[in-house]
């Protein structure tokens, strides 16, 4: 009798628990709220440097501490975004073609991961500033690279890196935001 009662209770519990129809509904999309600071800038104009430009107030200028660092190499560090723009400077000594080729090679090295690479030229004849900004879409290690020159004496190359695994769709808001800062840097760049 006890066995029969126990078995009846188990069967009833199983039937009752399976008979309820649950209403299922898709979960709504959730997006991370990103509070970006206002684009405001300050001037980098070190007396010893051959160039000057404006950079965001929420970024820091750091000396490049790499073993192969040359004079006037710096990083613009974005602590809130875990990103860094590496700036390298070279004096032009009949090697402009080599510097431009190296710049293009470093950009197109990323074709394996980049879905698209576009180039935009910037020209400021009055300041002798000539620049090309490369935008790399997709999961490339760097979303922006650029070079700036006066075509006779000075050459600066820059690249943006995030200190996280490159996932373009996740990083896109940050890439777009810092992209505006890079454009501003190029537009305010001047030689001394």
What are these regions (language model features)?
Residues 14-17:
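C-terminal motif of bacterial Sec signal peptides marking the signal peptidase cleavage site
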Residues 27-47:
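Post-signal peptide N-terminal segment of mature Sec-exported envelope proteins
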Residues 1-4:
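Positively charged n-region of N-terminal signal peptides that target proteins for export
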Residues 48-101:
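Secretory pathway targeting signatures of secreted, lumenal, and periplasmic proteins
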Residues 19-22:
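Bacterial signal peptide processing site
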Residues 102-159:
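Signature of long, low-cysteine stretches enriched in small and polar/charged residues
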Residues 159-192:
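Surface-exposed amphipathic alpha-helical segments
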């Amino acid at each position: 009798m006890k066995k029969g009662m126990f078995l009846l209770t188990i069967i009833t519990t199983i039937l009752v628990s399976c008979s309820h129809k649950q209403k299922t509904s898709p979960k709504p999309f959730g997006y991370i709220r990103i509070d970006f600071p206002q684009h405001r800038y300050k001037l980098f104009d070190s007396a010893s440097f051959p160039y000057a430009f404006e950079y965001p107030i929420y970024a820091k200028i750091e000396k490049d501490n790499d073993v192969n660092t040359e004079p006037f190499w710096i990083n613009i560090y974005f602590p809130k975004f875990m990103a860094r723009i590496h700036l390298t400077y070279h004096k032009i000594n009949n090697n402009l073609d080599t510097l431009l080729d190296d710049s293009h090679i470093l950009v197109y090295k990323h074709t394996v991961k980049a879905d698209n690479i576009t180039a935009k030229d910037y020209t400021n004849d009055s300041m002798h500033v000539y620049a090309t900004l490369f935008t790399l879409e997709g999961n490339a290690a760097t979303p922006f690279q650029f070079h700036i020159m006066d075509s006779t004496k000075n050459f600066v190359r820059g690249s943006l890196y995030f200190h996280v695994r490159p996932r373009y769709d996740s990083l896109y808001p940050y890439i777009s935001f810092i992209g505006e800062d890079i454009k501003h840097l190029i537009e305010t760049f001047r030689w001394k």
